[in-house]
Amino acid sequence: MKILLLTQVLPYPPDSGPKVKTWNVLKYLAQNHELTLVSFVRGDQSAEIAHLKTICHAVHTVPIERKAVDDMGYLLKSVLSNQPFLMVRDDRAAMRQLLAQLCAQTQFDIAHADQLNMAQYAEQVPGAAKILDAHNALWLLYKRLADTLGLGPQKLIYSRDWRLLKKYEGRICREFEGILAVSQEDKTALEEAMGQAREMTVIPIAVDLDELPLIERNPDADHILHIGTMYWPPNIDAVNWFIDEVLPIIHQSRPQTIFDIVGLRPPQELVERGQQDPRLNVTGYVEDTEPYYQKAGAFIVPVRAGGGMRVKILNALAQGMPLVTTTLGCEGIAVTHEKDVLIADTPQAFAEAVLRLLTDRALAEQLGRRGRELIRTTYDYRAACQPIDDLYRQVKG
């Protein structure tokens, strides 16, 4: 089939959660279909585009910039139009013009919108069956985020937008021929937005073990590690909660333990905290994360808001890392407490779980082995993505 894959970010290199998911779907689709990728790009990504052209039938891109001053204009437009801010912000005339040109040249069988932001573009592809690939139930993610915020302008904005997102997401899920959800929990949330039940294809986010070799951790590995894009509000909330509520308990027993916070664009407040306390190592983006994995006695995902599946958990398990997360953090992932990971939801319990991994090397190694085996048997992309073909055939009759 002729597939048009629409992405909000270029899915290569797979250096963030959404890009990992899309990258593995793209690889799978390119093996079986004539795949055209259309994506927004930021800055000079010519090397990444060249690599993607070796995999896809064609790659087309549209530049996009994000500026705080522009966001104020999009917020005003969102208020006036009563449409979700995220959708208004990514509605660009240049993308619509490119798609009009491509659709005049090619009759696509499938318009595959990767994430809700790109659904508005799939809608304009004539004659194609529309698929929404939902990385999460976006309305629920923003509702959970709003629930964690104190009173203030940010809470008002998120509280307004999750309600608009719920209405918008529900409409898309009713109108598109096919929906891909990453978990049963997300399927339920999407159906709530629709106001009705519907058939959806539930496919977990998948990874490629060939790209995720087992990490040989240092014998004296004793750092705590968090990896994630640090401009993403759920990650900011998670790291701040860990620093404020959990780390002081850990430091009572191990006062010199270092917390490595690795990820793109950390907020200035977090950078300043790292400058004031040498035990907080705020790195920003790093090309090679392996040295941080090697030093880590515990990998943490202390998330309290968000939705979908946490790719960082899949990556860490695939590389044999001992891991502590919250119940919400491992939502949608078939892990078992004390077998594959440690799960804790209160500061005291989370601190105790981290301390167990830092002090019990045998337990840490055991969890790492079992976690990697879980990924091998359940979350490898070659098997996990196969139902996409079934969905394509179904929607094309």
Describe the residue ranges of each PLM region.
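A short, well-ordered alpha-helix in the C-terminal region of glycosyltransferases
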Residues: 363-378, 384-389
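Conserved catalytic-core segment of nucleotide-activated headgroup transferases in glycan assembly
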Residues: 192, 202-295
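Conserved acidic donor-binding segment of nucleotide-sugar-dependent glycosyltransferases
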Residues: 341-348, 356-362
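Donor nucleotide-sugar binding/catalytic pocket of nucleotide-sugar-dependent glycosyltransferases
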Residues: 139, 158-214
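Short hydrophobic beta-strand element within catalytic cores of glycosyltransferases
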Residues: 312-318, 322-326
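Acidic donor-binding loop of glycosyltransferase active sites
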Residues: 177, 279, 291-308, 319-322
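Acceptor-binding helix/loop patch of EC 2.4 sugar-transfer enzymes
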Residues: 70-89, 130-170, 229
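N-terminal subdomain of nucleotide-sugar transferases
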Residues: 1-62, 105
